[in-house]
Amino acid sequence: QENSTAYHRNHESQHRNEFVTSNQDIKRALDIVKDVPLFDRTKQDIHDTILRLDNQITKVGVFGTFSAGKSSLINALLGDNYLVSSPNPTTAATTELSYGKESQITLKSKEQLLEEVNHVLEFYEISFNTLDDFIESDLDKLKLKLEKNQLAFISAIEKHYEMYTSMLEHSLIHTVSLEEIKKWSAEDEYATFVKTVHLKLPLDWLKGKIIIDSLGLHSNNQRHTNETEQILTSSDLILYVTYFNHSFTDNYKAFIEHMKDMNQLNENQAFKMIINAVDLAEDKQDIQAVEDYVADALGQVNLHSEIYSVSSR
């Protein structure tokens, strides 16, 4: 037994030394290419991953369609309704939760906001070269064309553009109180301007974790798609939340196939399937039937995952 214990200690020590060596090699490589004006996003992702590894922090990406109950699931894990999300996919922002006391918001840059304005108006064959051009246009006439969610987005920019530009002059990142976080997360007229909400809570359960409440899938927003892919590629654990009454739609299947096309779900990542709102089930047999259906659907895309049935109420 002593020989076995010594063997395991030596084995662990060898792996630890290999990890440290690899980590140092990557840091040196990053230092060499840091001034090369290419692949900035990739370089930043690698840097962030190394920082998390150094500090032994696990990044958990929570995914699902816009109404799957991701936020309610995270709140259930946290033990209170800390997380409030916008009901409007057009104005929604990614929320990043971690241990701490000072919460922050990262605003969209003018370029990002302009891109979203033009995306919303693309169907109407309208575009603007600058946000100032947009603000100076006939917005009353423009708003007559828009759907409800689009109208909320455009009206928010019209109403608070001066506030937004004033905040940008100081910084992209602003510290806000826990009470204000809810405003910037869930109210269209403020959430419109937010790229990321950094919610920090002094909860022991969050120590050693970063939890990302990703934007809803298939939102027809290129920024949302880009951010979803970035979170996917950098998460250590992927939780995929589906709703009991529509447990595996074509959209879910397309997303999982897209993950596999991106070469995600590799050996270093864990994937768990969460069926939310099982309190809607008639009985245990009803739950089992849905679990079997989801397992079969996952098998059809060659993915075999642990499935958890929960109620976030």
Language model regions located:
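N-terminal pre-Walker A segment at the start of P-loop NTPase domains
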Residues: 23-54, 188
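Charged, amphipathic alpha-helical linker segments immediately N-terminal to NTP-binding catalytic cores
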Residues: 1-37
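Globular "head" domains of long coiled-coil molecular machines
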Residues: 52-313
